Design a protein with these regions (language model features):
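Helix-helix packing/entry segments at the starts of transmembrane helices
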Residues: 10, 67-72, 139, 143-155, ...
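Cytoplasmic-side transmembrane-helix entry/capping segments in multi-pass membrane proteins
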Residues: 34-45, 89-101, 118-123, 142-154, ...
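Hydrophobic/small/kink-forming positions within alpha-helical transmembrane segments
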Residues: 20, 44-52, 74-79, 104, ...
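Transmembrane alpha-helical segments that form core, pore/gating elements
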Residues: 1-4, 19, 112-169
Length: 235
C-alpha cells in the first residue's frame, strides 16, 4: 500500500541520518572535497537511477526475470573497472563470474517472458549500478565512505521528496516499523559495499553481489517456510 517513491525515500532517509552521525563523529567533510564533487554526484545519480529502474523492472516483469537482469551488474563492473580504472582481470575471474551467473540463473529460473521497455529498464539498471560501483572504487582514497554514503543518501532523499509529497500515504505503525527496518538494513548494506570497494578491487568485489541470492534462500526458508528445489540448491 506504500507508493514506490515513499519506500525509496524512507530507505535513504535512514541512511542519511546514520551517515550524518558518523561524519560528525569522525569529523569527515560532510559534502566531500570540491575536486571530487563531480564523481560524488555521478555516483549518487547513477546509484539512484539504478534503484528506480530496478523498481520499474520489478513492477513490469516477473520477479525472476527482473532479478536475472539485475544480476548482470557484476559483468558491467568488471568491464568498466578494466576500461576506466585499469584493473587487471585474469581468466579465473572471468570464468568465476560466468559460473556464478549460471548458478544464479538456476536459482532464479527466469521465464524469459520479457517485454521490451521493462527489459531495457532492467538492463539499464544493471549498467547504472555497475557505473555507481566503479565510481565507488574510484573514490576509495579520495573520500571517506561515510561521506560517500551521506552524499548518495541526501541526493536520493531530495530527488524523491517531490514525488513523496505528491502521493504521500501515512503509514500505520506496522508499515512505519517495516519502512524503518528496510532503511536500517539497506544502510548496513550500503556501508558494507562502500567499504568493500574501498579496500578491494572492483573486479574482485562485484562477484559477491551474487551472495544475496544465497541469503534470500536462507531467509525465505526461515521466515516464509519456502523450500528451495533441486535446481536452486544446485545453483
Amino acid at each position: 500500500d506504500i507508493p514506490l517513491f515513499e519506500k525509496v525515500f524512507f530507505r535513504n532517509l535512514v541512511s542519511l541520518v546514520i551517515a550524518f552521525y558518523l561524519i560528525k563523529k569522525s569529523s569527515a567533510p560532510v559534502f566531500g572535497q570540491r575536486k571530487n564533487q563531480l564523481a560524488l554526484l555521478a555516483r549518487a545519480g547513477f546509484g539512484l537511477a539504478g534503484v528506480i529502474l530496478n523498481f520499474y523492472a520489478i513492477s513490469h516483469l516477473t520477479l525472476a526475470d527482473s532479478t536475472m537482469l539485475g544480476k548482470l551488474s557484476p559483468i558491467f563492473v568488471t568491464i568498466m573497472a578494466c576500461l576506466f580504472l585499469k584493473e587487471k582481470i585474469d581468466k579465473e575471474q572471468i570464468i568465476g563470474i560466468f559460473i556464478t551467473f549460471g548458478g544464479a540463473l538456476l536459482v532464479i529460473k527466469p521465464e524469459f517472458s520479457l517485454s521490451i521497455i521493462p527489459s531495457i529498464a532492467g538492463l539499464l539498471s544493471a549498467a547504472a549500478a555497475g557505473i555507481a560501483y566503479t565510481l565507488l572504487r574510484y573514490l576509495k582514497d579520495k573520500e571517506s565512505p561515510d561521506t560517500i554514503v551521506f552524499y548518495f543518501s541526501i541526493v536520493s532523499v531530495l530527488e524523491t521528496l517531490p514525488f513523496v509529497l505528491n502521493d504521500y500515504i501515512v503509514p500505520d505503525s506496522t508499515q512505519l516499523m517495516l519502512l524503518l527496518a528496510t532503511g536500517l538494513f539497506a544502510s548496513v548494506g550500503q556501508f558494507g559495499i562502500t567499504y568493500a570497494y574501498k579496500y578491494s578491487k572492483a573486479t574482485e568485489v562485484s562477484i559477491y553481489n551474487y551472495s544475496a541470492i544465497v541469503f534470500g534462500i536462507i531467509l525465505g526458508f526461515i521466515f516464509f517456510h519456502e523450500i528451495p528445489d533441486m535446481l536452486s540448491l544446485l545453483g
